[in-house]
Amino acid sequence: MKLFYRFRIIRIMFSITINPRFGDMDYLGHINNTVPSLWFEVARTQVMKIFDPELTLTKENFQLIMAHTEYDFVDKMYFKYEVEIKTWISRIGTKSFTVYHEAWQQGRLCVKGSAVIVHYDFDTNQSTPIPEDKKKLLEEHLLPKEASI
């Protein structure tokens, strides 16, 4: 009898570790529901460096705006344990892309969320196509299609 195992490798674009602060707790001792959005924002910094490596944040270099965010709270998180934030690119379109995040604590998925980022011209106030060289860099970190979100 032959056994076949199928392994799936998912590249993590970025992984950061957060040490929750005392002020991140609610009165029940859980991490407050407003906090993961801030952690995900910190994790997106590496994605933003694809477009503006020095993070100069000028309208000439940083032509991105956030159009939509959403979060699903899957399990509780607590103050005294580190949180790992994993970040991928889950979709690349013509003018926008989606960043997908997961917050893990003690081996448990606790929060998952995404942010739609639009390539934007601040002078014309219109979305613009993502430059091909930036798309290629984003594609290097694309979550495989077979991965379930």
Annotate each predicted stretch with a short phrase.
Residues K2-E84, I92-I149:
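Terminal targeting signals and extreme-terminal segments of soluble enzymes
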